[in-house]
Structures are given as structure tokens and as C-alpha cells.
């Protein structure tokens, strides 16, 4: 789909907040999201990344788009609950869901920067991450925002209690009390 002449792609939501559905998104928006992630985490051409989530959902798809757009080296492993098992090389950037993070905690020294999305990270797990050398960020986002729009560092000297909007993203509440993301 990425190399098709169409300006849009179909992505599928996971159904975490209701029934799974298909949505159309512009490739330009996907490129913008990839570049925002690259700028936020200081990714540069040749950095190594890990795809350990299914490509049928936005998180996996966006890891591929980031690699293509930013010139990153992409290592692909079968999605599993312990994706770092069998990885011998150092990974500069990876994305996981909380269960993958929990099952990989003893191998996180293989990853420089890790983002975690798809669900809240348990406070007990966050406590276990405090001496891990990896920079670990919980993300806030959804398929409709093409992954994360806010991050919260979970460990290290810059850890935070609150999510911070990424550069150029801001939030407001509308008349109905609903969150609006710009």
C-alpha cells in the first residue's frame, strides 16, 4: 500500500475502545508522524529499530513508515510476548505494548529508547524500570492520531508524572467536555 499511487492508506483500529474499524489516512499525515517521532527521539539515518508488533495495526505500520522515511535500519521479529529474546544486536529505538515490556525487562539493555503504548503501564512495572538503562516512554495516542501525540518518561533523570504533548500538538476540551487533539 505504501508504494501505491494512492494518497491514502487504510489502517485498522485494534478495537480497544469499541468494535475494530477501518479508517482512511493520508500518507502525508503518516510521513509527518514519522518525522515528529524522529525529531522527538533524535532518530537519525542508519539508527537501528525493531518491529515486534503486528503490521495490521497502526503501531506496526508506523514502525515501517518511520524506517522508510527516516532511513532507519529495521529488524523484524515475529510478534511475541518477549520480542527481545534472540536479539543480539543493539537497538536504538523500539515500540512495544506493556506485556512485551514486562516480559523483556531483563533484556532491555539491548534497547536505547523504547516507547510503550496500547495500554497503561502498571505502576508496579514502572517501579521495576527505575534502574533500567533504557529511556522508556509511555505514549498516549490512537490509530486516528497515527500513534503517539504525547509521551511520559517512565524512568531516568527526566522521568515525569505527566504526559507532555509532542511539539506542535496541543489539547483542548470542547463544549461537550470531549478532548480535542490538534
Task: Please provide the spans of the model-predicted regions.
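Conserved pre-ATP/AMP-binding loop-to-beta segment of ANL
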Residues: 1-12, 45-48
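Conserved AMP-binding A3 loop
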Residues: 8-35, 42
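Conserved S/T- and glycine-rich ATP-binding loop of Class I adenylate-forming
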Residues: 13-16, 49, 64, 94, ...
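AMP-binding/adenylate-forming
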Residues: 25-32, 48-103
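Glycine-rich helix-loop-beta junction characteristic of Rossmann-like nucleotide cofactor-binding loops
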Residues: 39-43, 105
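Gly/Ser/Thr-rich phosphate-binding loop
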Residues: 108-157
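Short Gly/Pro-enriched turn/cap motifs at secondary-structure boundaries
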Residues: 160-164
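AMP-binding/adenylate-forming core of the ANL superfamily
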Residues: 170-182
Amino acid at each position: 500500500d505504501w508504494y501505491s499511487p494512492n494518497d491514502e492508506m487504510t489502517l485498522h483500529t485494534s478495537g480497544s475502545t469499541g468494535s475494530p474499524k477501518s479508517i482512511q489516512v493520508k500518507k502525508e499525515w503518516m510521513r509527518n508522524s514519522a518525522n515528529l517521532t524522529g525529531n522527538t527521539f533524535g532518530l537519525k539515518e542508519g539508527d537501528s529499530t525493531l518491529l515486534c508488533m503486528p503490521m495490521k495495526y497502526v503501531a506496526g505500520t508506523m514502525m515501517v513508515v518511520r524506517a522508510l522515511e527516516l532511513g532507519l535500519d529495521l529488524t523484524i521479529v515475529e510478534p511475541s510476548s518477549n520480542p527481545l529474546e534472540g536479539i543480539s544486536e543493539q537497538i536504538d529505538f523500539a515500540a512495544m505494548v506493556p506485556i512485551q515490556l514486562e516480559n523483556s525487562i531483563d533484556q532491555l539493555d539491548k534497547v536505547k529508547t523504547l516507547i510503550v503504548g496500547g495500554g497503561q503501564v502498571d505502576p508496579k512495572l514502572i517501579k521495576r524500570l527505575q534502574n533500567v538503562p533504557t529511556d522508556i516512554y509511555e505514549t498516549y495516542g490512537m490509530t486516528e492520531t497515527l500513534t503517539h501525540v504525547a509521551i511520559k518518561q517512565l524512568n531516568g533523570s527526566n522521568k515525569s508524572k505527566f504526559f507532555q504533548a509532542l511539539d506542535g500538538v496541543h489539547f483542548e476540551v470542547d463544549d461537550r467536555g470531549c478532548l480535542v487533539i490538534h
